[in-house]
Curated annotation (Swiss-Prot):
<comment type="function">
    <text>Protein covalently bound to the viral DNA that acts as a primer for viral genomic replication by DNA strand displacement. Assembles on the viral origin of replication in an initiation complex with viral polymerase, DBP, host NFIA and host POU2F1/OCT1. The terminal protein stimulates the template activity over 20 fold compared to protein-free templates. Neo-synthesized viral genomes are linked to two preterminal proteins, one for each 5' end.</text>
</comment>
<keyword id="KW-0235">DNA replication</keyword>
<dbReference type="Pfam" id="PF02459">
    <property type="entry name" value="Adeno_terminal"/>
</dbReference>
<feature type="site" description="Cleavage; by adenovirus protease">
    <location>
        <begin position="265"/>
        <end position="266"/>
    </location>
</feature>
<keyword id="KW-0238">DNA-binding</keyword>
<comment type="subunit">
    <text>Heterodimer with the polymerase; this heterodimer binds to bp 9 to 18 of the genome. Interacts with host POU2F1; POU2F1 binds to the auxiliary sequences in the inverted terminal repeats and tethers the pTP-POL heterodimer to the origin DNA thereby participating in the assembly of the pre-initiation complex (POL-TP-DBP-NFIA-POU2F1).</text>
</comment>
<keyword id="KW-1048">Host nucleus</keyword>
<feature type="site" description="Cleavage; by adenovirus protease">
    <location>
        <begin position="116"/>
        <end position="117"/>
    </location>
</feature>
<keyword id="KW-1194">Viral DNA replication</keyword>
<dbReference type="GO" id="GO:0003697">
    <property type="term" value="F:single-stranded DNA binding"/>
</dbReference>
<feature type="compositionally biased region" description="Acidic residues">
    <location>
        <begin position="328"/>
        <end position="340"/>
    </location>
</feature>
<feature type="site" description="Priming of strand displacement replication by covalently linking the first nucleotide of the new DNA chain">
    <location>
        <position position="510"/>
    </location>
</feature>
<keyword id="KW-0597">Phosphoprotein</keyword>
<feature type="modified residue" description="O-(5'-phospho-DNA)-serine">
    <location>
        <position position="510"/>
    </location>
</feature>
<dbReference type="GO" id="GO:0006260">
    <property type="term" value="P:DNA replication"/>
</dbReference>
<comment type="similarity">
    <text>Belongs to the adenoviridae terminal protein family.</text>
</comment>
<dbReference type="InterPro" id="IPR003391">
    <property type="entry name" value="Adeno_preterminal"/>
</dbReference>
Length: 575
């Protein structure tokens, strides 16, 4: 009954014992909890252990409690079998490149997936039809598909527009860096953005930049690079280069790029220098090459122009302007002449810094709730681990399979946790009346014979405000360690096992210790499907009516009930 419209004189309260009046108590937030869980892609939803609690406190309050268990199944076997198909040509290198390229291309795609149960967003926008079978496979559209779909569903219209602009600029920067690394400036539209071109002196160059590079086909760029440098052993695999480019766009600023292998025009993405490019360096209309200091002076205007092109309703706050260049730098700029390769490296650095600063400015415009989605990011950690393992020669077929498995599990869990977080934590109205006491994620793997292969549980009962991010950090650390330590269980002594459990911050009731350790040597081919379950215990306020008419109706109902019991007792009949 608490899930229905209980307004006075509504059809739901017309009959006795309500008599046209709301009930004397309301479970605040209970309906919102049901609606949020029903609107997501869960296959099964169980609401249990509904009860009441009145702890000894002043003033005395009555609370409702409820434990929910919502789950869905992911078809792991179909994707894992896909990895063995002939399109990988039976070689590990091609298998690695195909998987990596599939993930990077998907992350930069524009797929929008939604959960079952809702066709219209909260602001009235029509959501696309869900391909339930596609979503239930472990071969969905990657971190940029499922996660972006969840993010767009929970965002306001203004935030959605900002997020789309951020994504467009990140994709454009990724494609630009890749084109620069492999000299893929074949078209006039791309060629005008070579470092040193006069387009970088225009205040709106970021908008033109996004239009020129955001819509390029990621996989086609990789194929073009492979054809151009086929047989060159001194050039890095284009798939790994694209992964490094993508990682660079996730950096918070230009300083953070060092860990991605990207740092300025000396770009370590392939083993060649910019001077390999045929032809002369681009020049402005007066025949003079643009210098880095000139591009640096235009940066604040370019960033603000890119942000200001969005509708006014999206703009909330202003970033402090970038510091103006010192006077001596301005004087030096007037005397600058064209310099060799180092100058072009500085120009490329300036392009990266300007794009990242614009992304940061757009993120500052997001609402607090939308900015919090960064807490559930995971792709960068997985890409970095894959590239590091490849460089160190530590990666085998088992490592790659485990990487794929845990990447997709992380995608599903992170996306769902963010959805739940946005409804139950970031939603201030909900948190005003309801707390999350316990959060638990349960993952169970099954083989083709429906026999359990492994089982893992992560549980948190910490501060309700941080319970989701705390649990996600543990799960992500666990997944990364499982991939990194692939196949190491057999050689572990007791001390190594305890060190591993400490590294993943293993806790009691997080699955049997032997099962946790066996996961390190688990053969992914045995897994056919995985059930992912999210268990949440809620505690909400019970509102007690003070309206005299409602209280009088309650007393009348209780009196009639008591009279019926007494009459039945006199007749010797059970009520």
């Amino acid at each position: 009954m608490q899930l229905r419209d209980l307004a006075p004189r509504s059809p739901n309260v017309a009959a006795p014992p309500y008599n046209g009046l709301p009930p004397p108590h309301l479970l605040l937030g209970y309906q919102a909890m049901h609606r949020a869980l029903n609107d997501y892609l869960f296959d099964n939803r169980v609401f249990m252990q509904i009860g009441y609690d009145s702890p000894p406190q002043r003033p005395r309050r009555l609370f409702w409690t409820c434990l929910t268990d919502c789950s869905y199944a992911v078809n792991v076997g179909q994707y894992m079998r896909f990895l063995d198909l002939d399109n990988f040509h039976g070689t590990f290198t091609q298998m690695h490149n195909a998987v990596l390229m599939d993930r990077v291309a998907a992350d930069m795609g524009r797929a929008h997936l939604r959960g079952r149960g809702i066709d219209v967003g909260r602001h009235g926008q029509v959501l696309p039809q869900l391909d339930a079978e596609h979503h239930s496979l472990l071969s969905g559209n990657g971190a940029g598909g499922l996660q972006e779909g969840v993010l767009m569903r929970t965002a306001s219209a203004a935030d959605a527009e900002l997020l789309a602009a951020i994504r467009q600029l990140r994709v454009a920067l990724c494609h630009y860096l890749f084109c620069y690394a492999y000299d893929l400036f074949q078209t006039e539209e791309r060629y005008r953005f070579l470092p040193g071109s006069d387009v970088f002196l225009e205040p709106n160059w970021l908008s033109y930049f996004a239009e020129a590079f955001a819509e390029l086909d990621t996989q086609q760029l990789v194929r073009d690079a492979e054809r151009k440098f086929r047989g060159r052993r001194d050039v890095e695999e284009p798939t790994e280069t694209m992964a490094r480019c993508f990682m660079s766009t996730l950096a918070s600023d230009a300083v953070s790029l060092a860990g991605t292998g990207l740092s300025g025009g000396a770009i370590t993405l392939c083993s060649r220098r910019v001077t390999d490019r045929t032809g002369l360096r681009p020049r402005d209309r007066h025949g003079r090459a643009i210098t880095a200091s000139e591009a640096r002076r235009i940066r604040p205007r370019a960033v603000r122009a890119f942000v200001d092109r969005l509708p006014r309703v999206t703009r909330r706050r202003r970033r402090p302007p970038s510091p103006a260049p010192p006077p001596e730098e301005i004087e030096e700029a007037a005397m600058e002449v064209e310099e060799p390769e180092e100058e072009e490296e500085e120009l490329l650095d300036e392009v990266i810094r300007t794009a990242l600063e614009a992304i940061g400015a757009l993120q500052d415009e997001l609402s607090g709730a939308a900015r919090r989605h960064e807490l559930f990011r995971f792709a960068n950690d997985f890409y970095r681990m894959l590239l590091t393992a490849r460089d160190a020669g530590l990666m085998g077929e088992s490592f790659l399979r485990k990487w794929v498995l845990y990447f997709f599990l992380a995608e599903h869990i992170a996306s769902t946790l963010y959805y739940l977080y946005s409804h139950f934590i970031a939603n201030r109205e909900f948190r005003r009346y309801v707390d999350v006491l316990t959060l638990q994620v349960l993952v169970v793997g099954w083989d083709v014979n429906a026999q359990q292969v492994f089982k893992r549980i992560w549980s948190e009962q910490s501060n309700p405000a941080t319970i989701f991010e705390t649990l996600w950090e543990r799960i992500l650390r666990d997944f990364l360690m499982m991939v990194e330590r692939t196949g190491q269980f057999e050689g572990m002594d007791d001390a190594d096992q305890q060190l591993f459990l400490s590294d993943i911050q293993y806790r009691d009731r997080s699955g049997d210790i032997e099962e946790v350790l066996k996961q390190l040597n688990l053969s992914e081919e045995l897994i056919d499907s995985i059930d992912i379950s999210f268990r949440i215990k809620f505690k909400g306020i019970v509102a007690i009516a003070t309206n005299e008419e409602i209280k009088a109706n309650l007393r009348r109902v209780l009196r009639h009930r008591r009279e019926d019991i007494e009459a039945a007792a006199r007749r010797g009949q059970p009520l």
